[in-house]
Amino acid sequence: MTPTQKDGPRSNQDIRVPHVQLINDEGQHQGVVSIQEALAMAAEAGLDLVEIVPNAEPPVCKIIDLGKLKYQTQKKAAETRKKQKVIEIKEIKVRPNVDVHDYGVKLKAIHRFIDHGDKVKITLRFRGREMAHQDLGLKLLQRVKEDTSEIAKIELEPKLEGRQMMMVIAPK
């Protein structure tokens, strides 16, 4: 690689081959022409000669506005970045002896997160003597699993880590 290498396709005097396959500014194939002839046609049209397919034999070049081409490729790249959805992991914290209404509120939040396409980590925290009743926590997580089975799949089965039990669910 030379230190003067530029970003993007080669254009005008940077194209160092004797002959190119030329596509004019209307998109019509002109056939194989010499590089001097192609550069003259580009200058006559007031546009640039841009290498489109450098690996072809001879390379395919097109007469277009280089600034416009760079703008369109940047715009296309920005559009694809915008369309990408970043999946987040949302966390819902519950206790083993959660009340009916509180459970309903937490379940509604889980449904909302799943509908938005995010993963949900359900964390069940045990305090003091609650560690002796881990079966209650497991039953609660099984209940969450059953209540969300239509819209979500289990990504990480319920497991105990220290004083808390956790489970991760993801959209189907």
Curated annotation (Swiss-Prot):
This is Translation initiation factor IF-3. It comes from Bartonella tribocorum (strain CIP 105476 / IBS 506). The keyword Cytoplasm applies. NCBIfam families: infC. It is found in: Cytoplasm. The keyword Lipid biosynthesis does not apply. GO terms for cellular component: cytosol; membrane. Keywords: Cytoplasm, Initiation factor, Protein biosynthesis. GO terms for biological process: ribosome disassembly. IF-3 binds to the 30S ribosomal subunit and shifts the equilibrium between 70S ribosomes and their 50S and 30S subunits in favor of the free subunits, thus enhancing the availability of 30S subunits on which protein synthesis initiation begins. Monomer. GO terms for molecular function: ribosome binding; translation initiation factor activity. It comes from the Bacteria. It holds the Pfam family IF3_N. Belongs to the IF-3 family.
